[in-house]
Amino acid sequence: MIKYISISLLISSVIFSQEIIHTEKHSTGDYIIYLEYYRKNSRGLVKTKKETYHPNGVMSSELFFRLGKIHGLNRGWYEDGSIGFEYSYENGKENGSWIEWYSNGQKSIEGTMKNGERDGLWTHYW
């Protein structure tokens, strides 16, 4: 089984100049990792997005980063393309809505996270 992982390191062209300085491809036999590195002027590299793919080429997950920490709405999908999860992060911690779905498209769990902890009412669907 080969998994495709594409990690993109991007910088806002409005604030910083973008220059691809290196591209790599790694294979461990189980998956392939594609890496693109962007220079943030003289201050190093910044990762802003990570994409993973199922062996059939369907996107498995899409994760966003800000200042090196997971941030924003992150999603995952099943091999058939149906949604599997939507998690909200803020500065590296779970913060906001947290929803998971069964592979048949029905919700399995729904709740809210605050600073990495469950907050309020959580609903489990059977």
For the regions a protein language model found, what residue spans apply to each?
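Sec-dependent N-terminal signal peptides
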Residues: 2-13
